[in-house]
C-alpha cells in the first residue's frame, strides 16, 4: 500500500482509477473533474480515520488511508474507491449527496437484491455498496471483498437489478428515489 505524500493535499484520478471507474460508469462521469483529497472533510476529528467522505464530487480520505493509486490497491481498497465513485456519480448527476449525507437517519449500507427492484430503489449508501459489490464480483472475481458476500453467486440477479444502469449509467432515473433531486 503506497500512501499519498503528506504535503500533497489533493490529486486527480490516475489513469488506472479512471479505467477502473469507466468499467462501471462509462462516460457518465466527468473524470478530470474528480479530486481525491489527502485529508478529512469534517473538522475537529469528526470524521473517523477509516471513513471516506464524498459530499461534493471530491473524495476525502484520512491521510493514513489515502492511496496514490487505488487501482493498484487491495481488492478491499478498490471496493472502497468504487463505493466513493458512486457518490461522485450521484453528485455529478445532481443528487444532493452532501444534504442527504448530513441527514443520515435511515441510510443503511445494506441492500437486498430482488428481481422486482432497480438501482433507484436503494438509498445512496446502499447504491454505493451494491455497485461496488457488483464491480468486485464481476470485474475482479473477488467475492471476498464484497460487503454482502451472501450475493457472491448471484451475478445474474445483480445484472437484472442493474439492467437500466448498465445500459444507461448517465440517466438520472438511476439515482435514489424518495428525495427531491437537485436540478442543474
Q: Language-model segments: what does each one mean?
A:
Residues 79-91:
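Active-site recognition of the HExxH zinc-binding catalytic motif
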Residues 1, 54-63:
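Short, charged N-terminal helix-start/capping segments
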Residues 42-45, 67-69, 143, 174:
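Residues in flexible loops and secondary-structure boundaries
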Residues 41-57:
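Charged, often glycine-rich, active-site loop that binds/positions anionic groups
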